[in-house]
């Protein structure tokens, strides 16, 4: 059985990303220009997700708030590895530019912000 995959556009993007990467609040202006595919597969206690997105000229931004964190009380470790472009993460412990083929790790109990540059972004 293959992973669940869906093509997403601005209006459906939040739900697709929430199912793959927990709850986030997205910048409405930059979200309106984002489209792509999200695929998720659960293997036992592990959820593997793939994103292939095209952002608009201003990139794409979002953040996890206290409300988002409380919506899923069980803590998770999240591994992200960009394979096209990079992701910039900001947390209470610092700022991190996760480059292509570099693994970033964060836990779901952290306040976190992300920013993608304009263009294509792909991650597993």
Label each region the model flagged.
Residues 2-122:
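N-terminal functional module of multi-domain proteins
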């Amino acid at each position: 059985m293959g992973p669940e995959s869906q093509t997403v556009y601005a209006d459906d993007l939040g739900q697709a990303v929430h199912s793959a990467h927990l709850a986030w609040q997205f910048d409405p202006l930059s979200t309106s220009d984002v489209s792509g595919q999200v695929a998720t597969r659960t293997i036992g206690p592990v959820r593997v997700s793939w994103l292939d997105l095209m952002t608009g000229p201003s990139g794409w931004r979002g953040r996890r708030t206290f409300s988002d964190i409380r919506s899923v009380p069980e803590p998770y470790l999240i591994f992200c590895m960009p394979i096209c472009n990079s992701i910039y993460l900001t947390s209470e412990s610092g700022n991190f530019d996760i480059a292509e083929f570099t693994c970033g790790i964060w836990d779901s109990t952290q306040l976190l912000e992300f920013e993608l540059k304009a263009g294509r972004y792909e991650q597993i």
